[in-house]
UniProtKB/Swiss-Prot annotation:
The active site is at R176, S226 (proton donor), E296. The keyword Transferase does not apply. Keywords: Cell cycle, Cell division, Cell shape, Cell wall biogenesis/degradation, Cytoplasm, FAD, Flavoprotein, NADP, Oxidoreductase, Peptidoglycan synthesis. This is UDP-N-acetylenolpyruvoylglucosamine reductase. Cell wall formation. Residues 32-197 form the FAD-binding PCMH-type domain. Its main location: cytoplasm. Belongs to the MurB family. PANTHER family: UDP-N-ACETYLENOLPYRUVOYLGLUCOSAMINE REDUCTASE (PTHR21071:SF4).
Amino acid sequence: MHKDDILKELKAIVPEEIIKIDEPLKKYTYTQTGGKADYYLSPTHNEHVQAIVHYAYTHDIPVTYLGNGSNIIIREGGIRGIVISLLSLDYIDVSDDAIISGSGAAIIDVSRAARDHGLTGLEFACGIPGSIGGAVFMNAGAYGGEVKDCIDYALCVNNKGELITLTNKELELDYRNSIVQKEHLVVLEAAFTLAPGDQQEIQASMDDLTERRESKQPLEYPSCGSVFQRPPGHFAGKLIQDAHLQGHRIGGVEVSTKHAGFMVNVDKGTATDYEDLIHYVQKIVQEKFDVELHPEVRIIGEHPLNEQ
């Protein structure tokens, strides 16, 4: 289909103001990298997401979902087809010991809402820079806690635009993985069941975790967060440190000297710089320790034309 025809048909199913054409994506990612999206849509209702996904399915148009871009690298060639930003689905509702949140809400804000209502169980998320949708997608966790510990259910959409409600068990939450990834679903909403707690104790725990995070992580630079999954029996950051790779730089991206598990954009780095550095670190760690590192960060999009 011609680009103008797709635009016309999209305008017929969702409000025109949520549609952008050839939208630069670098401003939506923590790494500050990325090319353009053919169509960038920011739905404000679940029904919008369903309509867009169903349209894309019936017209064989690829769909990519974005949260707040904290654990993703988008290549400079951009993303073909439709990109759906879920950030406008950011509601947070608290009732008794339960919180229901839209996919686009920051998990940090959900953690704070729990604290404000004297609910414990989400303290671990007080420093995770991701959206609820992304947190469920990868079973986000930190400091001994993870989404799996407290999520009740997630409302999802499949690739046909159909609604599916999945319980904690049905989500198949594992280390940085879930059925959402495996079946290419998208999370619209998640519900968490928490426990009553002492608000001062909850705040003290969050303060402690925040202090630990700020002292160890290179928050002063753009980054994609933790780059690699934890290999069985090892810590990725320790392996990278022992391989003397801290400070190693490709283009404008380097392995953080503050925390070896992070790669930071120190000087106008590109997605290609990130990808090349990831591959280099994997190669060296494999050679030195015979351990294979698997990226935790998602790398998506097209390579720029000059690299094809």
